[in-house]
């Protein structure tokens, strides 16, 4: 499993993924090209990359084309102010200040049979036990109908937030946007967070496995 990682504000996600057996390559912004991206099974974008990496405004087209051609793009949280790109996603996606600060907040699985929640790991509410600090932050609160929200969660007294994990088919690939705080859960060794992230990285591969079998 070759994973390309575009760094943002700095997080331990690349090292965490290496520890569980992924081959992770850091991709510098200037290395984002159609040729280079084809080497990877999935591309992950680090936290707040779209707030701080100027070059992404020129490279976003290549990342979205990578998805269109069958790639798997996983974007972690960005703040809703001062984005470097107008087209964060291939479809309308609007970030908000929505967050869930209670790390034990109930998580409802909206699409239990969705491939991302089924392969290779069957994700259940148990995978959201033992999280630290928060569930996530800066969730999108508006999105195009092409997106499927997979989870709902909220702090006490707040409305249900369904923007924590959104997936959209684009061309032959999958675009995934998540405000879940994987960057906090990995250092704490939260197994459910690892299991879910493994599914994000495998998105689109479930059919290949069926063909092999």
Report the location of each language-model feature.
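Extracytoplasmic/secreted envelope proteins and their assembly/folding machinery
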Residues: 10, 14, 37, 60, ...
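Alpha-helical scaffolding within the catalytic cores
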Residues: 29-32, 57-61, 159-165
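Short amphipathic C-terminal alpha-helix that caps PH/PH-like domains
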Residues: 192-204
């Amino acid at each position: 499993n070759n994973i390309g990682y575009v760094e943002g504000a700095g997080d331990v996600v690349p090292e965490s993924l290496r520890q569980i057996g992924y081959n992770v390559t850091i991709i510098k912004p200037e290395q984002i090209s159609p040729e280079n991206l084809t080497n990877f099974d999935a591309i992950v974008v680090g936290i707040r990359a779209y707030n701080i990496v100027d070059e992404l405004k020129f490279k976003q087209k290549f990342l979205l084309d990578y998805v269109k051609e069958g790639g798997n793009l996983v974007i972690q949280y960005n703040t809703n102010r001062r984005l470097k790109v107008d087209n964060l996603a291939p479809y309308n996606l609007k970030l908000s200040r929505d967050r869930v600060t209670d790390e034990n907040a109930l998580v409802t699985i909206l699409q239990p049979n969705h491939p991302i929640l089924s392969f290779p790991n069957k994700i259940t509410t148990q995978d959201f036990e033992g999280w630290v600090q928060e569930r996530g932050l800066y969730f999108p609160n508006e999105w195009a109908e092409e997106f499927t929200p997979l989870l709902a969660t909220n702090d006490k007294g707040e409305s249900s937030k369904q923007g924590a994990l959104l997936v959209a088919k684009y061309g032959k690939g999958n675009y995934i946007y998540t405000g879940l705080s994987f960057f906090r859960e990995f250092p704490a060794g939260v197994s459910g967070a690892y299991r879910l992230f493994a599914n994000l990285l495998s998105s689109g591969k479930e059919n290949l496995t069926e063909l092999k079998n």
